[in-house]
A protein has these predicted regions:
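N-terminal non-catalytic cap/leader segment that marks the start of a structured domain
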Residues: 1-135
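Non-heme Fe(II) oxygenase catalytic core, chiefly the N-lobe of the double-stranded beta-helix
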Residues: 131, 139-161
């Protein structure tokens, strides 16, 4: 499952969902739908943000997988609860970072080809220790952007990594 934080209308509160094909399933609306149409309230306790779901991930993830199994497999975008669709096209939303305000952000130096090229550009050979020791640095947790967001950068910038 690929989890997302999104909004359908700019300026509204972020919502917690996940991708299924080309649609985003809204977890809260889906839980209400299952409760009202199938009498199953267990999914109403799923947290309404990925940040909160991560606090008890084992329990949350099991419920999220079961929620998905409980939903119709076809025409998911035609189902609604209280006039709100339980699924919307992924093209019709604004994405936030999946965890909108992480407490910390570690950027791992983990892609071999990237590391090799960066070292070669500095006249260095690949260090064999890199294969045994994960290397990371702390980065700015407020500098995260959602899918398709415009990332601000200084005017003379010609390329982004």
């Amino acid at each position: 499952m690929k989890f997302v934080t999104y909004t359908r209308v700019e300026g509204t509160e972020p919502r917690f969902g996940y991708l299924r094909n080309d649609f985003i399933i809204d977890i809260l609306y889906a839980a209400i739908y299952i409760n009202e149409n199938h009498g199953n309230s267990e999914y109403l306790s799923i947290p309404t943000s990925l940040t909160r779901a991560l606090e008890n991930w084992d329990g949350s993830f099991e419920k999220l997988k079961n929620l998905d199994r409980s939903l119709p497999n076809t025409l998911i975008h035609t189902y609604s609860v209280h006039g709100k669709p339980i699924a919307v096209s992924s093209d019709s939303v604004q994405f936030f970072p999946p965890v909108p305000e992480p407490k910390t952000f570690r950027d791992f130096y983990a892609f071999e080809q990237h590391v090799k090229i960066a070292r070669k550009n500095r006249g260095l050979k690949m260090n064999p220790v890199w294969y045994d020791l994960p290397v990371f640095y702390f980065s700015n947790p407020t500098a995260l952007f959602g899918h398709n967001d415009n990332v601000p950068y200084p005017e003379p910038t010609q390329a982004l990594d």
